[in-house]
Amino acid sequence: MAELPIAPVGRIIKNAGAQRISDDAKEALAKALEENGEELAKKAVELAKHAGRKTVKAEDIEMAVKSA
């Protein structure tokens, strides 16, 4: 089961144009977001370490997204 709250995930799908969404679809998107988010976070941590910092900044996340 995904750790992300399901209601906001459902809103993301609705904002994309869906009228109805199954619970399985919400769970699947939540799982995918978590997996992708964790990979981006790992890249951002490495970028922060490379810059000599322990703190991950927004710029690290942005660079991780661009390099993905």
UniProtKB/Swiss-Prot annotation:
Keyword DNA-binding among UniProt keywords: yes
Keyword DNA-binding part of the UniProt annotation: yes
Classification via InterPro entries: Archaeal_histone_HMF, CBFA_NFYB_domain, Histone-fold, HmfB-like
Transmembrane segments: none
Annotated site location: Interaction with DNA: 14
Domain of life: Archaea
Primary localisation category: cytoplasm
Interaction with DNA as annotated region, ranges: 20-22, 54-57
Pfam families documented for this protein: CBFD_NFYB_HMF
MF term (GO), any: DNA binding
Compartment annotation: Cytoplasm; Chromosome
GO CC terms in record: chromosome; cytoplasm
Keywords for the protein's UniProt record, in alphabetical order: Chromosome, Cytoplasm, DNA-binding
Alphabetical list of CDD domains matching this protein: HFD_archaea_histone-like (cd22909)
Subunit field text: Homodimer or heterodimer with another histone. Dimers then assemble into higher oligomers, with the DNA wrapped around the protein core.
General function of this protein: Binds and compact DNA (95 to 150 base pairs) to form nucleosome-like structures that contain positive DNA supercoils. Increases the resistance of DNA to thermal denaturation (in vitro).
Similarity field: Belongs to the archaeal histone HMF family.
Protein name: Archaeal histone A2
Source organism per UniProt: Methanobacterium formicicum
